[in-house]
C-alpha cells in the first residue's frame, strides 16, 4: 500500500494499463460526483465490502479513494491483508481531486 499525492496518483493512473479505480464512498456521496470509470464498493458495508473485494482480480493495480483519504487508507490496508499487493490511496480524497469528475 502507498499513500500518493493527488499528482502522483493521477500521473500513475494515466500511465497504468492494469489499473482499476476503486471508490469506497457511500451511494449518497457517489451521487455528488465521482472519478470517471471508477468501481464503487462502500467500505461501510463491512463484511459485504470484504466479500466484494474477494471477487476482484488481485493482479490489478487499485487506485482507491474516498471523500478525504481516511476510509480509502483503511480500504488499502484491508486489501493488503487480503493479498492485494498494489493498492494506492489518494491523499486528500475526492474533496481535493482536481481531475475529471462524472455525475
Report each predicted region and the residues it spans.
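Rhodanese-like catalytic fold shared by cysteine-dependent sulfurtransferases
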Residues: 1-20, 27-61, 67-103
Amino acid at each position: 500500500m502507498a499513500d500518493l499525492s493527488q499528482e502522483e496518483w493521477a500521473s500513475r493512473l494515466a500511465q497504468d494499463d492494469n489499473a482499476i479505480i476503486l471508490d469506497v464512498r457511500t451511494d449518497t456521496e457517489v451521487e455528488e460526483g465521482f472519478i470517471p470509470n471508477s468501481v464503487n464498493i462502500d467500505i461501510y458495508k463491512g463484511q459485504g465490502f470484504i466479500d466484494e473485494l474477494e471477487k476482484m482480480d488481485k493482479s490489478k493495480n487499485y487506485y482507491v479513494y474516498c471523500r478525504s483519504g481516511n476510509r480509502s487508507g483503511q480500504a488499502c490496508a484491508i486489501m493488503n491483508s487480503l493479498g492485494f499487493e498494489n493498492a494506492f490511496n489518494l491523499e486528500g480524497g475526492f474533496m481535493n481531486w482536481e481531475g475529471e469528475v462524472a455525475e
